[in-house]
Amino acid sequence: MSFWDILGTLLIKPLQLLFEVVFVMANRVVGDPGLAIIALSLAMNFLVLPLYRRADAMQEEERETELRLHKGVAHIKKTFRGDERMMMLQTYYRQNNYKPTYVLKGATSLFLEIPFFIAAYAFLSNLELLHGVSFGPIRDLGAPDGLLTVAGVTVNVLPFLMTAINLVSCVIFTKGSLPKTKVQLYTMALFFLVFLYTSPAGLVFYWTLNNLFSLIKTIFYKLRHAHIILGVLFSLAGITAAVYGLFFYGQPTPRRLVFFIAAALVLQLPLLAVLCKGKVRLPEKLCGAQPSKKLFVSGSVFLAVLTGLLIPSAVIHASPQEFVNMTSFLHPAWYIVSALCFAVGTFVIWFGIFYSLAKPSVKALLDQCVWALCGIALVDYMFFGRSLGNLSAGLVFDNGLQFTTGQMLVNLAVVLAVFAAFTFAASKWRQRIPGILTVGIIAVVCMSVVNTVGICRSINEIKAGAQSDGGTPSFSLSKTGKNVIVLMLDRAMGPYIPYIFNEKPELEAQFDGFTYYSNTASLGIKTNISTPSLFGGYEYTPAELNARDQELLVDKQNEALKVLPVMFDQNGFDVTVLEPVYAGYGWVPDLSIFQDYPDIRRFNVRGYFSDPKLQKQAIRSNKRNFFCYALMKAAPLCIQANLYDYGTYNQGNFVSDDGYAGQSTDGALTASGISAGFMNSYNVLANLPNITQISKDDTNTYMVLTNDTTHDPVLLQEPEYVPAPEVDNTQYEREHADRFTVNGRTMTVEQRNDYAYYQCNVAALLQLGKWFDYLRENGVYDNTRIIVMSDHGGTMGQFPELLADDGMDAESFASLLMVKDFNSKGFTTSDEFMLSADVPLLAVKDVVAEPVNPFSGRRIDEVSKPKQEQLLLYSFEWDVNVNCGTQFIAGDWYTVNGDIWNKNAWHSVANKAVLTAER
């Protein structure tokens, strides 16, 4: 971030974020960008009304003073010259308690208007959501209005309307003012006409509404009993809005009903304030409290470091590797810098501006509010919403963000209790609060520094270990030799295959020669637990690894990843390793684990094929969203879902022509946006033909690839199953709802994640099918053994047959296994019981003369395969930064006897235990 980026984030982007959140929330409710602009204008004007009232009062005070002193100043300037004039003016000003710098008070409104205008301009002039959208006579809110054509010349009418309203307001406001004041305001009105003439109609419409609001405000300032009239008008507007929204505006939905009722109630507040004036008194201690600038500043700084430093740094520190893309590298610390700038700009600068312009009584109230906010934010962050599942690099929860009514009620009760306690503390020990907050600031900063140092250390290690062979990733396949390919699709669901092939029968021809093993189980339900045995065989099952309790899990993971590549390398194969999962226990695989084997080519490919422009868009999104995430975590549970907004954090430009940031879903069948995380993996599968080099020599080859296309659930456009900026599968699902029953077995597909996981699995297989066609066309399909498997299934609850009586979901173990051998034909299904640890045996069978583990010396073949039932670990401890000792953290252990689809075949062995294999 440059100096100007930081300055803009401090001053402008907090306002732009406010514009964006208000607009997106309004548009989500009313469903019309034009109406959303009206709602935005009303909301922003009411929000800053106290600010502008104070600024206008200061301006009026300065104007009256200027008029009062005008004759005296004019006389001095006419009578005296040089230093004598200066001395006389200084004396005259001092006698009238006036300083020349007070002239800045008259420009307060202008100083406030400039950043708000810049923020509105930056947001609305680039808002993709307005493009092509009509509103009334305006054909396109994303382009100049062009409402009038004269002699073939298109004239934009809105800027002239805006200027006319502005000039009328200026005439009323400057009545009796000095000529120079009038000239300043008229010049500004003409400037906006010229500057905004070619701007998008949506922006000009917004600014026209602002000028209209300003005109109404100016008129009411001149009326007697203006506050009563204004209160009545607001009340009538609220009633009208409620009637229109409830009975005449489109199809009513719960969200719209709540919105219009809430808006109607809010618009009753001005009238209520008028009616209650003088009748309702605040507690004497609250009314009589003196403002404490130290309290306000220390509270604002605490909120800034909590949301801008601690929360973002804690998220990144939990797994720094996830926030690194080596193909478009940005140090994650810059996300913290960006969040801190947002937070300082919001809580210190703009809160401070509001505070400085407030009356003393309001300042005292703001002191207590900021103090209470500190307590509420800290409690919400530390004690609520702690078990929300995996958080992706795009700050999206895998399982969404949902809270029960009970959880929200408990949280609300705690929030009210904290508010009451902090208010009581402020009334008793007000002078001590700044000191308490200072201690809190120091503690938060220290924790954040520790997090940041840990992040920097991890990133340095990642950069050192993630160096590939250089150049474009590629691998060779021989036309005359034998090729072995092992493809791991993370979290691919084995039970989905019959449904996918039923819907897409063309896959059967593309997967010619494959055998689908429908009765396959993994040794664990998380990648860190299951992949050692998948890549290393039965010596690396969870129980076997626990038995080696003098070695770190990361070292055993690295060893398992090297078993097959090193074995094939030692047997003369040309070996390529792509994205070795959890190598070095890093999200970005540490390729240095192969440094002792120079002939093994290795590459990290996730994100390599994504457009750099799109990656930069994702980076920009994260710079914004880290602060939004922090605000969400510090907010009460009842509003977190609205702030989270399905992982978009109310981002207006969520869908754009030149980038993606993530996906926002509205139900199970429709979505907007494209997920960067998904595309980083999907593009690898789509580019497999481009990185496959066909060799005519007889050198045998081995390639292993790990891919996350099936791991990052997003909604795709059916029936093509491709990512799209706008997804709407409503009609397709209505017409094909029966496809989830095959051979008498029904798979439950109801929720968003059910559809998303299924669609990602389909998308992955479709891309593999295209690649297999490419291999056929180039004559390297028949002489290639291909193993497609996954490390585990998912806890989805989609098959009643896999739900155990104790709550265990065996679908978590139901991994994918499909094998094509050399010269095999036809697509077949086998119900033979298989474990993921069988993959190494299948890979080396009949192609390695002496299949011996290069690290243990034990054979890897059917003869040496264990005969006893294997222990399967049902543990959700996926985080390798936590589950990183010498043994896996205690979990539940099961065995399965021959048939994963038979509930009676599953047996619980131990709960919350650490089991080891018998030796």
Residue ranges and their predicted role:
Residues 32, 146-163, 336-346, 405-418:
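Hydrophobic alpha-helical transmembrane segments
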Residues 34, 112, 413, 437-441:
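Sec-dependent signal peptide hydrophobic core
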Residues 234-243, 301-315:
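Canonical alpha-helical transmembrane segments of integral membrane proteins
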Residues 1-287:
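Helix-loop-helix
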